[in-house]
């Protein structure tokens, strides 16, 4: 009876440790590459692109509001 519980606990610990190892092995390299690219300045924000995106969003929102106002209310 005790061997069943020991085996179950062992398998659960094995699965949990495998998931933690996989998580950490993917997290650490991505964090290091993010820090390196931040120090090198590769991730500069393009404000003009963000402004254009916001203008397009506002324009589409206004067009949608206009379209919905023309639809009959049921």
From Swiss-Prot:
Propeptide: 46-74
Recorded GO CC terms: extracellular region; membrane; other organism cell membrane
Residues of the signal peptide: 1-22
Lysine amide modifications at: 40
Subcellular location: Secreted; Target cell membrane
Keywords annotated in UniProt: Amidation, Antibiotic, Antimicrobial, Cleavage on pair of basic residues, Membrane, Secreted, Signal, Target cell membrane, Target membrane, Transmembrane
Top-level division of the source organism's lineage: Eukaryota
GO BP field: defense response to bacterium
Family statement drawn from the similarity comment of this UniProt entry: Belongs to the non-disulfide-bridged peptide (NDBP) superfamily. Short antimicrobial peptide (group 4) family.
Known function: Antibacterial peptide. This peptide gene is up-regulated at the transcriptional level after the venom gland is challenged by Gram-positive bacteria.
Official protein name in the record: Peptide BmKb2
Species this protein is from: Olivierus martensii (Manchurian scorpion)
Top-level taxonomy: Eukaryota, Metazoa, Ecdysozoa, Arthropoda, Chelicerata
